[in-house]
């Protein structure tokens, strides 16, 4: 847990959703959330980082509580994310959130589930979310595909960037990392790659749906976030063009619920009800 705390306390989330593939992730996640959340809801954003989603949801007229492990992320949210909205931001742990039973319309777990490598802790986080939700309340949990690092490495294999070849797959250290992810789900960041995401548990949509059901929820569906469009050549340039962006979004919307696509998407969301 200390490694995860340090990763986010050192500013890993600042700017991440405003550049590169993060822009697509942010756009699509908001698009999906908007299908289920309008205004007037009590929302607990557990592990919500610097408050990008908390701020957006607050602007839609919701009472948002950002509960984040990393103290510096909370302070950043207070200093930078509330110029035109207000939400509660405080430190807390997804395993035991300081909120009353049956007090939330929505609980977001868009981070904790893929940083809890122990299944018992993932279930504990889910059960605490269940406890806090009102009857019929909405859970949205995010997962990272166990194939995400592998597909990314394949997408850049042999490309030249800044005069260097992108040949991560030829590095035994990197290859052992993705082998662990694909076989066990465990992502253990090598010391040789300090900018990679901190220790995590990468999974499949089916496994996450199963764990959510074990915690007592009624699972609605899994939805691919970036889907298959993330490896589009020149994605950033195409995203900036409105017509091209809509074509890309049409593709991911049409395929977002296909089980065959779920492992190809870096992130997916599972939607469930209490």
How should these model regions be labeled?
Residues 123-135:
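A short glycine-rich, Lys/Arg-flanked "PGG" loop and its adjoining helix->strand segment in the class I
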């Amino acid at each position: 847990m200390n490694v995860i705390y340090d990763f986010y306390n050192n500013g890993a989330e600042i700017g991440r959703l405003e550049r590169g593939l993060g822009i697509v992730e942010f756009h699509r996640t908001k698009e999906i959330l908007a299908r289920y959340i309008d205004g007037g809801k009590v929302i607990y954003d557990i592990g919500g980082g610097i408050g990008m989603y908390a701020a957006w949801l607050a602007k839609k007229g919701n009472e948002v509580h950002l509960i984040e492990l990393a103290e510096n992320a909370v302070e950043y949210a207070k200093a930078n994310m509330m110029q035109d909205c207000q939400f509660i931001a405080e430190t807390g742990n997804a395993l035991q959130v300081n909120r009353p039973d049956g007090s939330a319309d929505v609980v977001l777990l868009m981070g904790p589930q893929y940083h809890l490598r122990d299944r018992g802790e993932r279930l504990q986080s889910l059960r605490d979310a269940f406890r806090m939700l009102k009857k019929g309340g909405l859970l949205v949990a995010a997962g990272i595909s166990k194939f995400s690092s592998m597909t990314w490495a394949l997408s850049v294999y042999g490309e030249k960037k800044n005069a260097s070849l992108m040949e991560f797959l030829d590095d035994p250290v990197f290859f052992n990392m993705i082998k662990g992810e694909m076989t066990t789900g465990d992502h253990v960041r090598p010391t040789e790659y300090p900018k990679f995401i901190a220790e995590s548990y990468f999974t499949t949509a089916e496994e996450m749906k199963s764990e959510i059901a074990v915690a007592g929820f009624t699972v609605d569906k899994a939805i691919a976030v970036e889907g298959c469009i993330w490896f589009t050549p020149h994605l950033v340039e195409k995203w900036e063009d409105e017509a091209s962006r809509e074509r890309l979004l049409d593709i991911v919307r049409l395929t977002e619920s296909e089980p065959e696509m779920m492992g190809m998407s870096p992130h997916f969301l599972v939607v469930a009800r209490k």
